[in-house]
């Protein structure tokens, strides 16, 4: 069953990409909430195909995450290319986690994408 769903998801993403309806969702968040995102993806059946970059440093609207002696925390970054409906579910998950952990620094950016 999983293989059929994966093939269907891949086909839908490819169709969306060729029609210019593919979305790029970028999530940047404190490493402390990584498990919340990964569990949320799994439970909601979203974000099955993603790129994850660990040890991301930066400063946004919460405390800096620089991985040094002064600001020792680090961020994670996840990039997902998906159809609009899946992007909306990822946004909902990010908002839910942000509400649960308002001081952790969780950013979500969505843009149009296309397969070339």
Tell where the protein language model's regions lie, with residue ranges.
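Positively charged, small/polar-rich N-terminal and surface patches that mediate targeting and assembly
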Residues: 1-116
């Amino acid at each position: 069953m999983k293989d059929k769903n994966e093939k269907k998801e891949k086909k839908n993403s490819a169709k969306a990409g060729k029609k210019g309806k593919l979305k790029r969702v970028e999530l940047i968040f404190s490493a402390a909430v990584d498990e919340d995102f990964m569990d949320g993806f799994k439970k909601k059946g979203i974000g099955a195909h993603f790129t994850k970059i660990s040890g991301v440093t930066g400063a946004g609207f919460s405390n800096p995450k620089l991985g040094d002696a002064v600001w020792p925390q680090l961020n994670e970054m996840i990039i997902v290319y998906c159809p609009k409906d899946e992007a909306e579910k990822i946004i909902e998950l990010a908002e839910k986690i942000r509400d649960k952990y308002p001081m952790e620094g969780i950013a979500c950016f969505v843009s149009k994408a296309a397969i070339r």
